[in-house]
């Protein structure tokens, strides 16, 4: 259950949650930037209370570890890295399937420490979205980076 204080802290920008395209764009914008603090309140506002983030495979902070984390746990885990390192991530391809108010999205991304530089990492985010209360929410996100043993399939 979410308290009124939690709900107020999660108040989104209307344009960030108006459509599936908008919420996915907002996630990538909230994560990208030069070394320093991110707008964590903006990021939190995109997620349904109780949402889970599941980084798998090679991770910046803990290679090979798989954790199921709340949004706040993930922010606690990664914020020191973002404060010390520039990180730019953008979507390069998307596959989405919708049924009613739910959407399963496979979002292929590339990430780099330089917004104009060579790509450093590519991967896929599996995102589940839900339309409730006149807005879109992110319910869960699981992602993995591409490796030689785990290349991104052609359809993605």
Language-model features: where?
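Short beta-strand segments enriched in hydrophobic/aromatic residues
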Residues: 31, 47, 109-111, 142-144
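Non-catalytic cap/lid and distal C-terminal segments of serine-dependent acyl enzymes
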Residues: 14, 74, 121-124, 151-153
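A short, polar/proline- and glycine-enriched secondary-structure boundary/capping micro-motif
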Residues: 64-66, 116-119, 148-155
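Short, low-complexity N-terminal intrinsically disordered segments enriched in polar/charged residues
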Residues: 1-49, 156
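Hydrophobic residues on conserved beta-strands that form the core of alpha/beta folds
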Residues: 48, 91-93, 138
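Short beta-strand edge/turn micro-motifs at domain boundaries
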Residues: 2-3, 122-150
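Surface-exposed, charged secondary-structure patches
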Residues: 52-53, 57-115
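Short, hydrophobic secondary-structure boundary micro-motifs
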Residues: 39-40, 54-56, 139
């Amino acid at each position: 259950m979410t308290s009124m204080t939690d709900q107020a802290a999660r108040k989104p920008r209307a344009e960030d949650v108006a459509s599936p395209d908008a919420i996915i764009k907002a996630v990538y914008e909230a994560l990208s930037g030069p070394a320093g603090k991110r707008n964590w309140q903006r990021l939190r506002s995109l997620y349904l209370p109780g949402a889970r983030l599941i980084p798998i495979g090679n991770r910046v902070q803990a290679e090979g570890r798989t954790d199921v984390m709340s949004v706040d746990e993930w922010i606690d885990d990664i914020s020191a890295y973002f404060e010390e390192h520039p990180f730019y991530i953008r979507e390069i391809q998307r596959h989405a399937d919708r049924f009613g108010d739910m959407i399963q999205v496979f979002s292929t991304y590339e990430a780099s420490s330089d917004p104009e530089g060579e790509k450093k990492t590519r991967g896929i985010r599996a995102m589940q979205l839900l339309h409730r209360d006149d807005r879109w929410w992110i319910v869960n996100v699981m992602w993995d980076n591409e490796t030689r043993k785990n290349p991104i399939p052609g359809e993605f």
